[in-house]
Every structure is written in structure tokens, then in C-alpha cells.
């Protein structure tokens, strides 16, 4: 539905027995297949951003499925990527980063098994609230060149589609 974050949710929907009601999920607006189509069939994802592909082409079977679902992939919009959500923000180490609230660099990001970061040209991993540790590295960006850094609070807010005028108070870990 256009959010630059992979989120899995469970919905419980109920109605009183005396009410004649029907419910269905909203019609999807975006799809992973449409993003893959733009990356690997037309190349428009990379071209529109002035980039060379930063990921491996999917295996032949996956590519065939993407091509065979062409009609569906043209109807739905591509998933919004982490890159798309933060592309107009400067690197948090650049002096111009101070122009954006809560856009402060945090040192120390590093990958280890099971702690891999979010791929820049995919939607972000689900960001979790709280100071419970970060087992999957979802608060890190995995750059195509093999480097990593933590998302700033502002970048995390962008991924969750908070407006830029929202001010977050407290320590970075809160």
C-alpha cells in the first residue's frame, strides 16, 4: 500500500451477529512483483534514479514469473524502497544534515549473522519500537558497496511515513 517498509500484520475483524455486514481488505495498490518488473524487465527503477543495478538479477524461474505476470505488474505500483523514502535527505555526516530535525549520525553500525540491515533498493525491514535490542539489524542500512550505518531518527520516521515536521524527543535508543 505504498509504505517503504515490509510489515506483516494479523487483522481480526468481527461483527455483531445482528448486523448484516461484509468486509474485505482494501484493493492492493503496490506489489513486490511490480518493483521487480521495473528493476529487471524494463530497468526503469534504476534508470529513473540514475543508478546501475545494485542487486543480483533474480534466478530464471523468478524472472519468468515476473514477465508472465506483466499485466498485473503494470496495473499495480512498485513497492516503495528505503532509497525512495530517504533520497532527498543528505548523508547524516554532511554539515547540511543539521537542516533536518532528528537527522543525526550514530556511529557503530556493523553486520553479523542474523543482523544484516535493510537493503537500500527494497522496502525497509519492519522497524520496531522500544529499547529491546535489534536482533535483525532493521535499524541499519546495508549499502550496495558493503558498508553499513544506522538509520537516523528522521530516516526511521520517513520509513514509517511520519511527516517531517514531527519532532521526536528523548535519546536515540528510546
What do these predicted ranges mean?
Residues 80-174:
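C-terminal target-recognition/interaction regions appended to catalytic cores
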Amino acid at each position: 500500500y505504498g509504505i517503504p517498509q515490509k510489515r506483516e500484520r494479523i487483522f481480526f475483524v468481527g461483527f455483531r451477529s445482528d448486523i448484516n455486514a461484509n468486509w474485505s481488505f482494501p484493493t492492493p495498490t503496490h506489489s513486490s512483483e511490480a518493483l521487480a518488473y521495473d528493476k529487471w524487465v524494463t530497468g526503469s527503477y534504476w534508470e529513473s534514479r540514475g543508478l546501475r543495478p545494485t542487486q543480483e538479477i533474480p534466478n530464471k524461474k523468478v524472472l519468468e514469473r515476473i514477465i508472465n505476470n506483466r499485466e498485473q505488474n503494470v496495473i499495480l505500483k512498485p513497492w516503495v524502497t528505503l532509497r525512495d523514502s530517504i533520497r532527498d535527505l543528505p548523508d547524516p555526516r554532511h554539515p547540511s544534515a543539521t537542516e533536518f530535525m532528528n537527522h543525526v549520525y550514530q556511529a557503530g553500525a556493523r553486520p553479523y549473522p542474523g543482523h544484516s540491515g535493510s537493503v537500500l533498493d527494497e522496502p525497509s525491514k519492519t522497524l520496531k519500537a522500544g529499547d529491546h535490542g535489534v536482533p535483525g539489524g532493521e535499524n541499519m542500512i546495508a549499502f550496495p558497496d558493503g558498508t553499513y550505518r544506522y538509520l537516523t531518527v528522521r530516516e526511521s520516521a520517513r520509513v514509517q511515513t511520519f511527516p517531517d515536521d514531527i519532532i521526536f524527543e528523548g535519546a536515540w535508543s528510546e
